């Protein structure tokens, strides 16, 4: 290093030679120190070359940069995958909303209420029960003022029982007023048909024997008179007038009395009429 003593001290950072470049470090007042290895004195300036030592910090920086690059790439991949998943979920939700059935009614749960299918079905059932209870309250008089399902049901039960008792009482009263219909088990329609048949039998019974009596009777002509009424309770009367003969047929509270006076032919006629009445009631 004795050959470089003639160089000025102002050059701190390096020296340019014909065949190489020499780095040196030092201050203005101190001796110059170099980081290059020692150069033998025999070596000439023309053939001398300085090999710089690379610091280990550069080697350490490379793997760190590679690690950070790999981490950044991994994070970017994860972010992309998460974005794809979120996009797929949003797309699937949109499809489900579009493909929802038309009859389905979306019920938005209130605060403190669940949204699962079981709770929704239970809520619908309770709403139906409340509607039926309102209808029953409207049917029962004075039941609108009652609160509580148990009390409402008690009022409804009592009202139905009272209606049942009234129906039974009315049916018993009707049966007591018309014992003929309920005693014999005859309906009102059947009873009206039966009365019409009886009237027809009366007309036939009166018309046929009257012609017979007119042929075999005395010169004094006999005639038949029949009084009928559907509304009044007056009895049916059959009178045959002629000479000293007199027959009468009367009805009093369902009992028929036959009074006969005269010849055997007239008695036979009266028996025929009575038999017809008896057959009609059997």
Curated annotation (Swiss-Prot):
Residues 75-84 have a biased composition (Basic and acidic residues). Keywords: Activator, Nucleus, Transcription, Transcription regulation. The keyword Transcription regulation applies. SUPFAM superfamilies: HLH, helix-loop-helix DNA-binding domain. Preferentially present in anthers and leaves lamina joints. Expressed in seedlings, leaves sheaths, collars and panicles. Residues 45-55 have a biased composition (Polar residues). Belongs to the bHLH protein family. This is Transcription factor BC1. The keyword Transcription regulation applies. InterPro entries: bHLH_dom, bHLH_ZIP_TF, HLH_DNA-bd_sf. It comes from Oryza sativa subsp. japonica (Rice). The gene is BC1. One of its GO terms (biological process) is positive regulation of DNA-templated transcription. Induction: Triggered by the transcription factor RLI1 to regulate leaf inclination in response to phosphate (Pi) availability. Repressed by phosphate (Pi) deficiency in lamina joint cells in a RLI1-dependent manner. By brassinolide (BL). Homodimer. Component of a nuclear cell elongation controlling complex made of ILI5/BUL1, LO9-177 and BC1. Interacts with ILI5/BUL1 only in the presence of LO9-177. Interacts with IBH1. Binds to LO9-177 in the nucleus. Interacts with BCL1. It is found in: Nucleus.
């Amino acid at each position: 290093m004795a050959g470089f003593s003639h160089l000025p001290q102002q050059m701190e950072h390096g020296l340019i030679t014909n065949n190489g470049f020499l780095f040196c470090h030092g201050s203005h007042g101190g001796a110059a120190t170099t980081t290059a290895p020692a150069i033998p004195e025999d070596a000439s300036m023309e053939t001398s070359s300085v090999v710089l030592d690379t610091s280990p910090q550069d080697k350490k920086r490379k793997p760190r940069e590679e690690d950070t690059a790999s981490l950044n790439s991994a994070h970017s991949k994860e972010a992309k995958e998460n974005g794809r998943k979120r996009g797929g979920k949003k797309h699937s939700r949109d499809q489900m909303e579009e493909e929802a059935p038309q009859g389905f009614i979306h019920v938005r749960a209130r605060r403190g209420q669940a949204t699962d299918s079981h709770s929704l079905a239970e809520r619908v059932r309770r709403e139906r029960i409340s509607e039926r209870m309102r209808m029953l309250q409207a049917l029962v008089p004075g039941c609108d003022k009652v609160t509580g399902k148990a009390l409402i049901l008690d009022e409804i039960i009592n009202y139905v029982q009272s209606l049942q008792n009234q129906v039974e009482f009315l049916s018993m009263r009707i049966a007591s007023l018309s014992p003929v219909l309920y005693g014999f088990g005859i309906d009102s329609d059947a009873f009206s048909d039966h009365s019409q048949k009886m009237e027809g039998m009366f007309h036939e019974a009166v018309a046929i024997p009257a012609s017979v009596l007119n042929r075999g009777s005395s010169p004094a002509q006999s005639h038949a008179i029949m009084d009928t009424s559907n509304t009044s309770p007056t009895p049916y009367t059959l009178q045959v007038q002629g000479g000293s003969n007199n027959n009468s047929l009367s009805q009093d509270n369902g009992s028929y009395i036959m009074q006969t006076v005269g010849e055997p032919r007239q008695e036979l006629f009266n028996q025929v009429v009575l038999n017809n009445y008896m057959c009609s009631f059997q």
